[in-house]
Each structure stands twice: as structure tokens, then as C-alpha cells.
UniProtKB/Swiss-Prot annotation:
One of its GO terms (cellular component) is external side of plasma membrane. It comes from the Eukaryota. Forms oligomer. It holds the Pfam family UPAR_LY6. Residues 1-18 form the signal peptide. The keyword Signal applies. It is found in: Secreted. Disulfide bonds join 28-55, 31-40, 47-73, 81-98, 99-104. InterPro entries: LY6_UPA_recep-like, LY6G5B, Snake_toxin-like_sf. This is Lymphocyte antigen 6 complex locus protein G5b. Glycans are attached at residues 141, 183. Transmembrane segments: none annotated.
Amino acid sequence: MKVHMLVGVLVMVGFTVGKVPVPDIRTCHFCLVEDPSVGCISGSEKCTISSSSLCMVITIYYDVKVRFIVRGCGQYISYRCQEKRNTYFAEYWYQAQCCQYDYCNSWSSPQLQSSLPEPHDRPLALPLSDSQIQWFYQALNLSLPLPNFHAGTEPDGLDPMVTLSLNLGLSFAELRRMYLFLNSSGLLVLPQAGLLTPHPS
């Protein structure tokens, strides 16, 4: 009887000592804007969150074609895992997917792991009209502090960091402003390094 008790105690001690500590943080791929045909346009870094949170991929579709992808560290207060949602425009909809391992929200293919060089004279063209740009990002529930625009003009005296450009093409400087909006909206936990340095446009 004593031998069985001793063996039981040793087994319990072995299980206790042999447990591998669970990391307190999870590391995910981060890309603020990814075009499947080009790669990661802005971001191409990593972000970290608590191990109880999940990595997330938000795929934005135009009809049935993948148009943009956002990768980052998801928060429960934002998009729900496996959620599909339409935007205000019937052609655009998105799906949110989550996973629970380090770097599980991987790139579409190996060549997409590095960001593109930032050109000085070529803007990023989006398939949206001037009037749709502000509504599209609002439709994605990003809680952007956008003012009311009249006749396609921007009121004087507004801080450029709290407005989105209504031009058809977005420069990389404007993508950085969009990054700030996303970072404050609760959509994703985004890294600070490497994205906020001013760049001439």
C-alpha cells in the first residue's frame, strides 16, 4: 500500500515539475494593408498580445474576389472570429478569421513577407471613388473620426492626422495616417515601430 502511495506521489510530482510554462504573450504577423497581387503594402512586421487573445486575418472581398487583407493582433471587442459582414456597398464584404498560435495568421505566399519599397511619386490606387473612400472605412466599423464633407472638399483648419484623404490614390504618408486611425479604433493592436517616421510624398 505504501509503495502504491509513493508511486502516486512521484507521478504527481513528475507531472507538476514537467509542465512547460505557457508564454504570457502571443506573436502575430502584422500587415495594415495587403494586396494579394502585390503583397504587403504597409506594415510587414509583427505585433504581440496577451496569450489569451488571438491572431486575426480580416479578408476584404469585392464580390467574390479577395481585394485587401489586414493581418494583426485581434481583440475581442472588435471583429468576431468567423464573422462575415457586408459593408454599405453591396459589392464589398469581409470575413474575420482567428487563430491561437504564434504567427498563425501567415502570409499568402513567401514572397509577400517583405514590404514594398516606398516610391516618392506613385500613389496606391484603390478601386473606390472619391466619395466612397470615407464610407468604405466607416462601413468596416473602424470608428474613424471623419468629418462631414461637402462637394468633395475638405474644410479648412482640420488636423491632417484626423482626416482621410478623399483622393482616389492614397500615398504612403496617408497610409501612415490610416495606421494611426486603426491603432486608436480598437480594431487591431498594432506595433509602433517603423511606421510613423515622416516620409516625403
